[in-house]
Swiss-Prot record:
Protein known as: Pantothenate kinase
One record GO biological process: coenzyme A biosynthetic process
InterPro entries given in the database record: P-loop_NTPase, PanK, PRK/URK
PANTHER family attached to this UniProt entry: URIDINE KINASE
Gene Ontology molecular function: any one: ATP binding
One term under GO cellular component: cytoplasm
Length: 316
């Protein structure tokens, strides 16, 4: 633990919640409670105070960083005497299952759109790049879903490299949490946004995390700014179980849901199954593949109880 703290002290500036909140300066709050309702995850009680204290300072920081990158591009264009295609600024958001990555991504998207310098902000989740269910079954990876090998990395890297190259239209596959599979014949169109947010479990992964002898590009090679949403594992497991119980009476009750058979479970049965899924799949994936990438992030958002951020770590 001491060695880990020393590494963090060397790499990061640490801000307590109130210290970070003061960095908001005069950035206005443009979201209402109604807006926030649309952005919340199923198991999160995020408040406007959380947006004000954590996300507004972060949107201000990102606006400044994106502006600096845009200015650098203008200087290079002047030096080279040419105008290259528009290239989006790419932000990645990583973290465990149930930590709230998707909510963080949606809130940041909503806030970053308010800045006149970059009004077009798109969001893509890596869930769509999981192999189709039939392929996962064929490869014997159904119980490894979410692990790095369950993703079509070739397709994902092709997608993000086209985005980075400034292609005018790029398509991303869409994932359904109802069917637990890619949506056939439906794709998300990405048309040269100012900023692209890509959210997923393993977006901080590099070649150092694989046993492949041949070097190959990873999502992290194309990312301009990376965020890791962090929490202690006991909290993550608790949040996962709570989310599972809510899905049981919500999404799982849909007859078309892949997990419809869970909808008839008692509370005790559902809790035991969710705990087992965590212990056998999500927990090992966190400790083997996700958590080891945390200290590569430019920014770490640390959560405590009730999904409240209590510390922000920013790379020096």
């Amino acid at each position: 633990m001491r060695a880990n703290n020393q590494i963090h002290n060397a790499l990061y500036l640490a801000f307590a919640r109130q210290q970070w909140a003061e960095l908001r300066k005069s950035v206005p709050l443009t979201l209402s409670e109604s807006d926030l309702d649309d952005l919340r995850g199923i198991n999160e009680s995020i408040s406007l105070d959380e947006v004000t204290d954590i996300y507004l300072p972060l949107s201000r920081l990102l606006n400044l960083i994106v502006g600096a990158k845009q200015q650098r591009g203008l200087v290079l264009n002047q030096f080279l005497g040419r105008v290259p295609p528009k290239r989006p600024y790419i932000i990645s958001i990583a973290g465990s299952v149930a930590v709230g990555k998707s909510t963080t991504a949606r809130i940041l998207q909503a806030l970053l759109r308010q800045w006149p310098e970059h009004p077009k902000v798109d969001l893509v989740t890596t869930d769509g790049f999981l192999y189709p269910l039939s392929e996962l079954k064929r490869r014997g990876l159904l119980q490894r879903k979410g692990f790095p090998e369950s993703y079509d990395m070739k397709l994902l890297v092709e997608f993000i490299s086209k985005i980075k190259a400034g292609e005018s239209l790029v398509h991303a596959p869409i994932y359904s949490h109802i069917s637990y599979d890619r949506v056939a014949d439906t794709q998300q169109a990405i048309e040269q946004p100012d900023i692209l947010i890509i959210e997923g479990l393993n977006v901080l992964q590099t070649g150092q995390d694989t046993h492949v002898a041949i070097q190959q590009p990873f999502v992290s090679d194309f990312v301009d700014f990376s965020i890791y949403v962090d929490a202690e594992e006991p909290l993550l497991k608790e949040w996962y179980i709570s989310r599972f119980l809510k899905f049981r009476t919500g999404a799982f009750s849909d007859p078309n849901s892949y997990f419809h058979h869970y909808s008839e479970l008692t509370d005790d049965e559902a809790t035991k199954i969710a705990a087992n899924i965590w212990d056998s799949i999500n927990g090992p994936n966190l400790n083997l593949n996700i958590l080891p990438t945390r200290d590569r992030a430019h920014l770490i958002l640390r959560k405590g109880t009730d999904h409240m951020m209590h510390q922000v770590l920013m790379r020096k």
